[in-house]
């Protein structure tokens, strides 16, 4: 057999041209220990803080501790079958969750996966859970209200769009009830709502979802559930996931409201993770960065200006501002607001609504303590008519509390003091409100007008509730057009004052209660 050198060279060239090798560079590591949802990994030299690490079985862990010779990561989900020696690898991505209008009306877990049995979610994309908050230049001052429908809140501690208003109190004082009613009151306001349940019983979350559905508010709400049975990692990340879903609406020139229920349990979950990662404990065994845990979350709630929205949407949305309003909830122990986490969150937020167990147990619900409840920026966002008429309420209550304490020791009181005590009792009675009965701006205005201009003076204390019910019924039935107009504008002038006066005069002359 004779070999032709030309044929051989052609054959070699052909084979070289056809040769195709696929090389893949992967940053891999090996699990060296697994305990309590924390894995230690040898290798992964290029891993980033907060990066997702791919585990066997289509699961992920988040890198939190970057040490000299190992990486500490927290597993997102079940970890019982993970074992020493298993191979893991970097993904080059941080945690992202689905965002978009398709999530409205759905119940999802921390990772944005549906858990309500209603099928897949059509999302508009993904967003990182950790995002830097808008800068000072991108923000706009708070000057539009978020109506909660509660007389005590909207009159004394008003909330504005883009504000962070803390709801704080002991367990069983009506914190969740207040937040849920605020969500229900937004069903026709155009404000999208996100409810983040952290560390609660699954039955409690199911009850909240049912109540939202019954009152027609679920279609406008995303529920993010990280129940007590979920891992500490998912409870720690749930607020950030919910915030990313809310930012989708804010950045497109819309308004959103997010409730974190509650951040005390998130701090406990983060403390658990930090201690398992062997980070040094500080006050109350919390890690040193627990303040940053909440500040970086709550700073993302803001009102952004038109330029920010236009730049974000690449010119698709013009002339619109967006907002994300946050209602974080903190549970105190025996009314101690000077504990570590409560003081942190009070210092971060723009005000707090303090709910007191003594008031709650004495039948004053919502149990708002007007003495230490405050809204630092909401006053500029308050509806004109409510702002004008609510001025005397806080003063009346403050004077009443002071006199009531003094009256316990005094045997006989002069007429002026007795009159002031009677007025304070009636105002306190009038501010009581049942759950799931939010009031419109016009309804609140009529009630506040009655307080401000002495229409309650001749009404017995025991008849205040029936007086209020009859007054609202009379106003809505006989002056529906005026009430609708007042709800729309929220203005207050001499003409509106005269109309309100004629409504009250007509009611007292012709109605029985």
From Swiss-Prot:
GO molecular function, one term: proton-transporting ATP synthase activity, rotational mechanism
Top-level lineage group: Bacteria
Bilayer disposition of the protein: Peripheral membrane protein
Record keywords: ATP synthesis, ATP-binding, Cell inner membrane, Cell membrane, CF(1), Hydrogen ion transport, Ion transport, Membrane, Nucleotide-binding, Translocase, Transport
EC code: 7.1.2.2
Compartments where located: Cell inner membrane
Group of enzyme by EC: translocase
Keyword Secreted: no
Keyword Cell cycle among record annotations: no
Catalytic activities: ATP + H2O + 4 H(+)(in) = ADP + phosphate + 5 H(+)(out)
Cited CDD domains: ATP-synt_F1_alpha_C, ATP-synt_F1_alpha_N, F1-ATPase_alpha_CD
GO terms for cellular component: plasma membrane; proton-transporting ATP synthase complex
Subunit structure: F-type ATPases have 2 components, CF(1) - the catalytic core - and CF(0) - the membrane proton channel. CF(1) has five subunits: alpha(3), beta(3), gamma(1), delta(1), epsilon(1). CF(0) has three main subunits: a(1), b(2) and c(9-12). The alpha and beta chains form an alternating ring which encloses part of the gamma chain. CF(1) is attached to CF(0) by a central stalk formed by the gamma and epsilon chains, while a peripheral stalk is formed by the delta and b chains.
Role description: Produces ATP from ADP in the presence of a proton gradient across the membrane. The alpha chain is a regulatory subunit.
Family of the protein in this entry: Belongs to the ATPase alpha/beta chains family.
Protein name: ATP synthase subunit alpha
Organism name: Haemophilus influenzae (strain ATCC 51907 / DSM 11121 / KW20 / Rd)
């Amino acid at each position: 057999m004779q070999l032709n050198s030309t044929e051989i060279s052609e054959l070699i060239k052909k084979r070289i041209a056809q040769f195709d090798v696929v090389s893949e560079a992967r940053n891999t590591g090996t699990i060296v220990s697994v305990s309590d949802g924390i894995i230690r990994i040898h290798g992964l030299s290029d891993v980033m803080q907060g990066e997702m690490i791919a585990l066997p079985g289509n699961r992920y862990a988040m890198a939190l501790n970057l040490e000299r010779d190992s990486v500490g990561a927290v597993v997102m989900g079940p970890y019982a079958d993970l074992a020493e020696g298993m191979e893991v690898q970097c993904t080059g991505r941080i945690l992202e969750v689905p965002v978009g209008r398709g999530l409205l009306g759905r119940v999802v877990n921390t990772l944005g996966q549906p858990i309500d049995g209603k099928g897949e979610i059509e999302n508009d994309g993904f967003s990182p859970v950790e995002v830097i908050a808008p800068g000072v230049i991108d923000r706009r001052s708070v000057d539009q209200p978020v109506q909660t429908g509660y007389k005590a809140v909207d009159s004394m501690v008003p909330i504005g769009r883009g504000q962070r208003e803390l709801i704080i109190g002991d367990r069983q004082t009506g914190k969740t009830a207040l937040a849920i009613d605020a969500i229900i009151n937004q069903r026709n306001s155009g404000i999208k709502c996100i409810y983040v349940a952290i560390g609660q019983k699954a039955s409690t979350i199911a009850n909240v979802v049912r109540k939202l559905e019954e009152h027609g508010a679920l279609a406008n709400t995303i529920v993010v559930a990280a129940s007590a049975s979920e891992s500490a990692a998912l409870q720690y990340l749930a607020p950030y996931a919910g915030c990313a879903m809310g930012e989708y609406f804010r950045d497109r020139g819309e308004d959103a409201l997010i409730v974190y229920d509650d951040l005390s349990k998130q701090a406990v979950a983060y403390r658990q993770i930090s201690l398992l990662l062997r980070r040094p404990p500080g006050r109350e065994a919390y890690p040193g960065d627990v303040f940053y845990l909440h500040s970086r979350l709550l700073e993302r709630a803001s009102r952004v200006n038109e330029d920010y929205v236009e730049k974000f949407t690449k010119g698709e949305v013009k002339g619109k501002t967006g907002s994300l309003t946050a209602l974080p909830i903190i549970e105190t122990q025996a009314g101690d607001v000077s504990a570590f986490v409560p003081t942190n969150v009070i210092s971060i937020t723009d005000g707090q609504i303090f709910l007191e167990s003594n008031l709650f147990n004495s039948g004053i619900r919502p149990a708002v303590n007007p003495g230490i409840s405050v809204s630092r920026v909401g006053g500029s966002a308050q509806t004109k008519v409510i702002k004008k008429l609510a001025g005397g309420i806080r003063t009346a209550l403050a004077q009443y509390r002071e006199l009531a304490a003094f009256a316990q020791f005094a045997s006989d009181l002069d007429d002026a003091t007795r009159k002031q005590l009677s007025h304070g009792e009636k105002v306190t009675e009038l501010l009581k409100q049942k759950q799931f009965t939010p009031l419109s701006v016009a309804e609140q205005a009529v009630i506040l007008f009655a307080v401000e201009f002495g229409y309650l003076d001749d009404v017995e204390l025991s008849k205040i509730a029936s007086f209020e019910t009859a007054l609202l019924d009379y106003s809505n039935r006989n002056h529906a057009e005026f009430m609708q107009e007042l709800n729309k504008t929220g203005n207050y002038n001499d003409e509106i004052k005269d109309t309100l006066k004629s409504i009250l005069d007509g009611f007292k002359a012709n109605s029985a209660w």
